[in-house]
Amino acid sequence: PPRSTLDRSSAASDVYKRQVEGFGYELSATRVGSAYDPGVGYVQRTGFTRIGDRIFKGWTAPSESSTLRHLLSMNGYLFLRNEDRSLESAEIGPEWKIDAKSGAVLTLTAKAIYEDLPYSFKLSESAHVPVGSYSFHDLSASYRLPISNMVRLTAKGSAGSFYDGSRLSLGLSPGWSISKHLEFTGNYQYERIRFPDRAENFDSHIARLRVETALTPKLSAIAFIQYNSAVDRVISNFRIRFNPKEGSDLYIVYNELLNTERYRHMPNMPLRDNRTLLIKYSYTFTLGG
């Protein structure tokens, strides 16, 4: 059937008052039609109206305290279906962010979550979430060492209910700036999900390593490797950029996808699922006046 202009459009508005100390707010409303096409890129949802986001109060700690600043906020949003104005999903909860004088940051968050699923979805071949309406909660904490340190670390953890089950999530993100020419960053994420009433479990380990080097101002390289136990795959990306002069760039990019568990399906999977080599050269012309 023909779609109205409203179905094919998207609109958004926001009002805010941002400040370091005292009360502030960030409020927004977005409407996306059911037939909306962004033209470039994509949208995760269509046919919804979203309302959010937060009110907060910030204050500076006393001079004798080891903390520098506090920010206490109430965050929340809701998604309504345009078709019948029914509630699709919602989230609300407080957050407390503490900035230390050393540069470290501690964040504590609590959430109450609602999801109405018209379709089931799979986490893996052995775990799924069925159709239904769910209310669950989550408690999380994160701690970040000062980003100015040569060695950095961010640790995160969360636990709570998850649809009709439970969830535990742990994460570590280390970083090491050896020099201005070489930097290592990593990330490890563990997810443990249990649905005891349905005897379904899901565990995943995701590990990432990124190496950046700038041998000279004109020559730099980046290497990225990721392992995901949920799909038993390793993704690698290597990129070299050579910039001999302003407006002239040469890129060499190599991508590879490896299967770490080749015998989980029949027929057996290949060791390399995908491998590409891309060479790109760009030059910017300047037209004289």
Predicted regions span which residues?
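Outer-membrane beta-barrel translocator domains and adjoining extracellular loop/strand segments
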Residues: 10-13, 37-42, 83-90, 118-125, ...
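Residues on the lipid-exposed face of transmembrane beta-strands in outer-membrane beta-barrel proteins
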Residues: 14-18, 53-57, 94-98, 141-145, ...
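Residues that define the transmembrane beta-barrel architecture of outer-membrane proteins
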Residues: 47-51, 88-92, 135-139, 166-168, ...
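Short loop/turn motifs that connect adjacent beta-strands in outer-membrane beta-barrel proteins
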Residues: 17-24, 60-71, 100-105, 150, ...
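Outer-membrane beta-barrel "beta-signal"
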Residues: 238-254, 259, 268-289
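Single conserved hydrophobic/aromatic residue that forms the stacking wall/gate
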Residues: 1-12, 16
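Transmembrane beta-strands of outer-membrane beta-barrel proteins
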Residues: 23-27, 70-74, 106-108, 153-155, ...
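Transmembrane beta-strands of outer-membrane beta-barrel pores
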Residues: 29-35, 57-59, 76-82, 112-116, ...
